[in-house]
């Protein structure tokens, strides 16, 4: 019985909604008919006469006051709408209309019927949004001592934010520490050093860790009863201490490379020892995992030092060997370093081979992957591309592929073209980036702008085609074309990652809703009319009468501004202006 009653109520509700949706004209005529039938009991004629008499007794000052009051209310609404839009990025009235009024009018029936089916899709989109708003370590990050600090010494500006450096400290604690560090004095010191906020305190702690390893431990071994022999044993070097000094104390890339080579000797020895003991327990396994991260980090930074010092082929070889030795450590994104080095060598065939492996639908994308693929496609046609010729004959297959690759890259990260086309100034890239955000665009363009300039016509092709992407995705926050909708969180995260002197690029740009613009125009227009009517009541009355005559005339289609002013002059009986006299000598 209960189920039957519930079904009947649902059917009744659906019938009512259907009637209001499709039969509103019938309801309207029914209401008019009832009003006509009840016109005598309701005294409609008397009430209309009373209202007409009241309106006839009103003075112009009442209408001026009414107009001023409406202008004031419209201004208050405008101010509130502008404040709400600046704070939340949407119109308050639009949000209320969509969220509360639309369900009452039956605009969400389809969604309610598919509620159970859409729950899984919502959860998937939420997970995707969270993954896209994740902050990643910049695979091409600079050296603090040799590059970031030198920029600070020259300009007096801090290129790194506290939030960015705090994320780096968390990464160092994750990669370079383990639970057994307290058993070794040097590692215990370094565990505290990674938590230090003061750079000088971190450097001092690294030196202290190295000094502890210089102390020799003596082990007394009795060989003869009458004498003893002292066996001298050196403690292993602390690789993480060398890493910290190379990153923060070295003022040149050459000095950093020397320190990383010392770190490689120490880290390689620790890695070999822990590799033999990794199966003896969870503690040894964690230590081996830490030593693996240390060794991979050192080799990657050594390859980057070689790339900075101009030994690009050596850097490519080191990166390839590292990727073969540790193929599962994709967290460091070494393939992006390899792509940049191969582009410097102009080894485009090797670049294409790397892209074929990593530009896969199952792997996370990046600006380096998408824009490098677009660069290779553009390289095939950019030297002969001409917008005029393309508009006459149309795009060829190769040109169409290049344009589609550019559109794909721009959809993934729409901030990059402004930096590649030098429409915005570059800054030093941060140590962490947000994929599809302004921080990733800066990190990519900082290293890859030279590669785009080297390919003849590539920037011209990008300049002619990149804005066409936005016509394909008019609502990027709601629906994408080749990727998921653009995440909303990029602006907030980029403001935390990028320094304050940089103007963060925002996509899509927040435009004022039409309701706010309409309210502003209506408010200004009514306020102006009220002011003119109060100051010049006779002139405004004549002007209004002339406007009514023009709108009601049969020749309204031929009206213009001159006819309006002629009618106003006729009403006011303004004499014509005297004609100028010409004198002859």
Swiss-Prot record:
It is a multi-pass membrane protein. Keywords: Glycoprotein, Membrane, Phosphoprotein, Transmembrane, Transmembrane helix. The modification Phosphoserine is found at residue 386. Pfam families: ST7. GO terms for cellular component: membrane. Belongs to the ST7 family. This is Suppressor of tumorigenicity 7 protein. It comes from Muntiacus reevesi (Reeves' muntjac). The lineage of its organism: Eukaryota, Metazoa, Chordata, Craniata, Vertebrata. The gene is ST7.
């Amino acid at each position: 019985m209960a189920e039957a009653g519930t079904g009947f109520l649902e059917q009744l509700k659906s019938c009512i909604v259907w009637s209001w949706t499709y039969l509103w004209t019938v309801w309207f005529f029914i209401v008019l008919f009832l009003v006509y039938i009840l016109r005598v009991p309701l005294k409609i004629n008397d009430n209309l006469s009373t209202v007409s008499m009241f309106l006839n007794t009103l003075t112009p000052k009442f209408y001026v006051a009414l107009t001023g009051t409406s202008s004031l209310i419209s201004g208050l609404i405008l101010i509130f709408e502008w404040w709400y839009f600046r704070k939340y990025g949407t119109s308050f009235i639009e949000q209320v209309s969509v969220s509360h009024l639309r369900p009452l009018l039956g605009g969400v029936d389809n969604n309610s019927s598919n509620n159970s089916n859409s729950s899984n899709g919502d959860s998937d989109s939420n997970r995707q949004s969270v993954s896209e708003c994740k902050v990643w370590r910049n695979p091409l990050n600079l050296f603090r001592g040799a590059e970031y600090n030198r920029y600070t010494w020259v300009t007096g500006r801090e290129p790194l934010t506290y939030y960015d450096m705090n994320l780096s400290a968390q990464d160092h604690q994750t990669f370079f520490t383990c639970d057994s560090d307290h058993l070794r004095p040097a590692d215990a010191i370094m565990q505290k050093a990674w938590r230090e906020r003061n750079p000088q305190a971190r450097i001092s702690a690294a030196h202290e860790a190295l000094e502890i390893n210089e102390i020799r431990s003596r082990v007394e071994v009795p060989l003869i009863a009458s004498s003893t022999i002292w066996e001298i044993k050196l403690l292993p070097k602390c690789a993480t201490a060398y890493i910290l000094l190379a990153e923060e104390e070295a003022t040149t890339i050459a000095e950093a490379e020397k320190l990383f080579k010392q770190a490689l000797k120490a880290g390689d020895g620790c890695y070999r020892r822990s590799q033999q003991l990794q199966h003896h327990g969870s503690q040894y396994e964690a230590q081996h995992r830490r030593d693996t991260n240390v060794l991979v980090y050192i080799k990657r930074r050594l390859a980057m030092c070689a790339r900075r010092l101009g030994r690009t082929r050596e850097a490519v070889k080191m990166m390839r060997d590292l990727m073969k030795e540790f193929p599962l450590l994709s967290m460091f994104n070494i393939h992006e370093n390899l792509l940049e080095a191969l582009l410097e060598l102009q080894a485009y065939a090797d670049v294409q081979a790397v892209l074929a492996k990593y530009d896969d639908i199952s792997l996370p994308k990046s600006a380096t992957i998408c824009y490098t693929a677009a660069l290779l496609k553009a390289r095939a046609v950019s030297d002969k591309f001409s917008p005029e010729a393309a508009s006459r004959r149309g795009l060829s297959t190769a040109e169409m592929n290049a344009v589609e690759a550019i559109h794909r890259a721009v959809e993934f990260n729409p901030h990059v073209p402004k930096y590649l086309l030098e429409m915005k100034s570059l800054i030093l890239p941060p140590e962490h980036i947000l994929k599809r955000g302004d921080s990733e665009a800066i990190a990519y363009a900082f290293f890859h702008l030279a590669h785009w300039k080297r390919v003849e016509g590539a920037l011209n092709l990008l300049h002619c085609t990149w804005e066409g992407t936005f016509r394909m995705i008019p609502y990027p926050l709601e629906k994408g074309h080749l990727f998921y909708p653009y995440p909303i969180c990029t602006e907030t995260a980029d403001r935390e990652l990028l320094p304050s002197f940089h103007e963060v690029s925002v996509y899509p740009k927040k435009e004022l809703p039409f309701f706010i613009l309409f309210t502003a125009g209506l408010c200004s227009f009514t306020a102006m009319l009220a002011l003119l009517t109060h100051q010049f009541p006779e002139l405004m009355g004549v002007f209004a009468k002339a406007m009514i005559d023009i709108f009601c005339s049969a020749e309204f289609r031929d009206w213009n501004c001159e006819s309006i002013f002629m009618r106003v002059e006729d009403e006011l009986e303004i004499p014509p202006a005297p004609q100028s006299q010409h004198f002859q000598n």
